[in-house]
């Protein structure tokens, strides 16, 4: 009995040791689950964790000398590209990192200066200025007709207007109305104003030659009456021409568009007054399309003024 009891106690002891060993093997913290974890005084686990994170991401302090040279070069290139890429992203300007990271060498600087000096010493080929092409203006095909020419001449002598009015034909003199003798001839059909100072104005001729011829005829009449008349300083003072554009014109639109040059008061005068600057001509434009040009000293000014105004009038043609 004693032997069996001792054997049983031994087996029970072995079983207890096996159970205790298995529990420590598979659940080693089981005996300590009920114990609370107490941190050591002066220890901060959060700072330790953050420090570990920083160490895990920052490899700048890691010794990479054991790596091959090509891997070290790639790492350096990546570090150089990172700030340049951030700069490009912030500023919006595309920069070449390879050019920024590699400064000019002395030889490259010398080559650059030589290139610039070569550019300065290169001969400059003179450029011929091109005259801009101006569109050819549409010709009107209309030639204004001269209606009146006013000319002046100096007879260079004092005249007795009463004697001229009494002895000359087709002459009238009324000093209360006008202080000049009004004389007319039929060929060319003109009128002369003769003043006592010897100045004479001839008007009504249709051409320059007719105006000169008429002035000479009036001077001959004065000579025949006993005055020492001469023929000096003949000059054409004004030429008047007229034409028809053959279409009605919107004068209201024309005066609004060309306010600086034109005036239109239909209650006072039915025509629009257009004062052209070059040539210095005054035009009277009517709704019917009739145009009167005055103020010219030469025939060419009449033609030039009409060619300038014709495209403008065509732009204000009435559609109905």
From Swiss-Prot:
GO cellular component, one term: nucleus
One GO process term, biological-process aspect: transcription by RNA polymerase II
Record keywords, A-Z: Developmental protein, DNA-binding, Gastrulation, Nucleus, Transcription, Transcription regulation
GO molecular function per UniProt: DNA binding; DNA-binding transcription factor activity; RNA polymerase II general transcription initiation factor activity
Segments traversing the membrane: none
Function as written in the Swiss-Prot or TrEMBL entry: TATA box-binding transcription factor. Members of the TBP family are differentially required to regulate transcription and development during early embryogenesis. Required for gastrulation. Regulates a large subset of genes that are ventrally expressed. Binds to a subset of promoters.
HAMAP family in UniProt: TATA_bind_prot_arch
Protein name: TATA box-binding protein-like 2
Source species of the chain: Xenopus laevis
């Amino acid at each position: 009995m004693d032997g069996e009891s001792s054997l049983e106690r031994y087996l029970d002891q072995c079983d207890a040791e096996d159970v205790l060993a298995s529990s420590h093997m598979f659940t080693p913290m089981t005996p300590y689950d009920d114990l609370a974890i107490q941190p050591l005084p002066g220890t901060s686990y959060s700072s330790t964790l953050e420090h570990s994170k920083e160490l895990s991401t920052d490899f700048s302090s890691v010794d990479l000398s054991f790596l091959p040279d090509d891997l070290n070069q790639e790492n350096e290139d990546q570090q150089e590209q990172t700030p340049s890429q951030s700069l490009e992203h912030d500023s919006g300007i595309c920069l070449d990192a390879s050019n920024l990271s590699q400064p000019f060498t002395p030889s490259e600087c010398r080559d650059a200066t030589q290139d610039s000096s070569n550019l300065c010493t290169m001969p400059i080929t003179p450029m011929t200025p091109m005259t801009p092409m101006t569109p050819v203006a549409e010709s009107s095909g209309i030639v204004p007709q001269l209606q009146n020419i006013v000319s002046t001449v100096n007879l260079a002598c004092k005249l007795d207007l009463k004697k001229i009015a009494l002895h000359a034909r087709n002459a009238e003199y009324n000093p209360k109305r006008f202080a000049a003798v009004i004389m007319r001839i039929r060929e060319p059909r003109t009128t002369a104003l003769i003043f006592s100072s010897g100045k004479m104005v001839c008007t009504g001729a249709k051409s320059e030659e007719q105006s000169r011829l008429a002035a000479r005829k009036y001077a001959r009449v004065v000579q025949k009456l006993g005055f020492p008349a001469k023929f000096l300083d003949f000059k054409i003072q004004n030429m008047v021409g007229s034409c028809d554009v053959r279409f009605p014109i919107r004068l209201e639109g024309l005066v609004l568009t060309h306010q600086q040059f034109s005036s239109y008061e239909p209650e006072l005068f039915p025509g629009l007054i257009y004062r052209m600057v070059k040539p210095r001509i005054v035009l009277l434009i009517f709704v019917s399309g009739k145009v009167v040009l005055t103020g010219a000293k030469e025939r060419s000014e009449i033609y030039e003024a009409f060619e300038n105004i014709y495209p403008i009038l065509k732009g204000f043609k009435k559609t109905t």
